[in-house]
Regions:
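Asp-box/BNR beta-propeller blade signature and adjacent active/binding-site loops
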Residues: 18-127
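Bacterial N-terminal signal peptides
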Residues: 5-14
Length: 127
């Protein structure tokens, strides 16, 4: 009986895993890497997913980094196309935006996005 239970659990997890969706895939048509995903559920039930898109190919401070979002109104069964939330210029204080954290305040019906911005890599920054 124990083996049957283990097999049933394995089968269920396999079925769940096959229903997963990759929202941001490095190697897609952009040719750029995606990193640092974030997700939150808004008061209206929508799921909002964010990720860095890194045209510069590296970390914040090495060039342009954007934050993209995708939204699901059906609890993740389908998703919108990716749209930019913040777009880096590649130089200066707005060179890149990344390492996003997303918080949904359901009482106030607001979203808070916190991220890093700039043109200096972390290891070269000063306090």
């Amino acid at each position: 009986m124990r083996i049957l239970s283990i097999f049933a659990a394995f089968l269920a997890s396999t079925l769940i895993a096959s229903a997963q969706t990759c929202l941001f895939h490095t190697g897609d048509s952009t040719g750029y890497p995606y990193r640092i995903p974030a997700i939150a559920k808004a008061k209206n039930g929508q799921l909002i997913a964010l990720s860095d898109l890194r045209p510069c190919g590296g970390d914040i401070g090495y060039g342009r980094v954007d934050i993209l979002s995708r939204v699901s109104a059906d609890n993740g069964a389908s998703w919108s196309e990716a749209v930019p939330v913040l777009q880096g210029s590649g130089k200066g204080a707005d060179a890149g935006y990344g390492d996003a954290c997303l918080v949904a305040d359901r009482d106030r019906n607001e979203l808070l996005l916190v991220c890093v911005s700039g043109d200096v890599p972390y290891w070269q920054s000063s306090p």
